[in-house]
Amino acid sequence: MTTHFLYIEPNTSIEEVKLLFEAHLLSALPVCEGNTFIGVLRKEAVDEEDKETTVADYQYALERFFVPLTATWDTVIEAFASYHTDMLPVINETQQFIGYYYLGDFIQQLTKTPFIQEAGRILILEKSAHNYSFTETSKIVEGNGGKVLGIYLSNRTEDNVHITLKLA
């Protein structure tokens, strides 16, 4: 999480907002009053707008998405996908802006995990959605001299699951 306090306030000019979008290559910026989170302003909401206006003139365009300070990595990934954004504000239980997750930084951190870093082979298994076990799958791999570097469900339907394994 970036604890750099990059946010805009209601009195910030749209001209300054456009410069911030350009300088930081973000698709959205958090809007705060003091440290209190108000919402998120997307770049496309102000792309063609008059530079003489302020963020307060775009209250109608503010969206209210964020992740709590206690969010787990899977919640953060889901939020990035759900909100189609490259920036997720992080707020605490009193609605105070703490920082934000930047999608690029988050992906970079994921690439440092052994699942991505270690050399190995990817194997995708299709199993019954009602009869699969990570433990059983791992035991079969390890019982045959393999080493499981990572395992996750990459797809799920009513009848089947795809289990993606990275093997050493």
Report residues per predicted region.
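A conserved regulatory-domain signal marking ACT and ACT-like small-molecule sensing domains
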Residues: 119-168
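Signal for well-folded cores of large energy- and translation-related assemblies
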Residues: 22, 81, 111, 141-142
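Regulatory loop-to-helix N-cap segments in sensory/regulatory domains
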Residues: 48-49, 110
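Bateman/CBS regulatory modules and CBS-like beta-alpha motifs in cytosolic regions of diverse proteins
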Residues: 1-20, 31-32, 37-42, 51-79, ...
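Short low-complexity, flexible loop/linker segments enriched in glycine and/or proline
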Residues: 45-46, 58-59, 163-167
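Histidine- and aromatic-rich ligand-binding microenvironments
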Residues: 30, 45-46, 105-106
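Long, contiguous binding/interaction regions
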Residues: 22-23, 103-119, 136, 168
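Short acidic/polar active-site loop segments enriched in Thr and Asp
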Residues: 27, 86, 147
